[in-house]
Amino acid sequence: MPYLIVTYDIAEERVNKVRKILKKYFMWVQNSVFEGEITEGKLLKCKLELEKVIDKEVDSVYFYSLENRLNYRKTVLGIEKEITGNIL
């Protein structure tokens, strides 16, 4: 199962809608950053939901895919938000 890091740059009036969608699929780790494992089917569903909300002329959502969550290293400077878990 791929492990994704998702970041976004969204116009203020759509930020809450985008955040709400991403929270259904990923763990929220910072203001505009989410991460987590996801199936291809759920990833497709997430992207379809986002496409209905974003304005492709001004908004951006970036998906960084890693083979799995064991093949990357994360270093945090400062406080790391508590991850309570995510059911996919």
Swiss-Prot record:
Family: Belongs to the CRISPR-associated endoribonuclease Cas2 protein family.
InterPro entries in alphabetical order: CRISPR_associated_Cas2, Virulence_VapD/CRISPR_Cas2
Quaternary structure annotation from Swiss-Prot or TrEMBL: Homodimer, forms a heterotetramer with a Cas1 homodimer.
Job of this protein: CRISPR (clustered regularly interspaced short palindromic repeat), is an adaptive immune system that provides protection against mobile genetic elements (viruses, transposable elements and conjugative plasmids). CRISPR clusters contain sequences complementary to antecedent mobile elements and target invading nucleic acids. CRISPR clusters are transcribed and processed into CRISPR RNA (crRNA). Functions as a ssRNA-specific endoribonuclease. Involved in the integration of spacer DNA into the CRISPR cassette.
Record has Hydrolase as a keyword: yes
GO BP annotations listed: defense response to virus; maintenance of CRISPR repeat elements
Binding residue positions for Mg(2+): 9
Organism classification: Bacteria, Pseudomonadati, Nitrospirota, Thermodesulfovibrionia, Thermodesulfovibrionales
Official protein name in the record: CRISPR-associated endoribonuclease Cas2 3
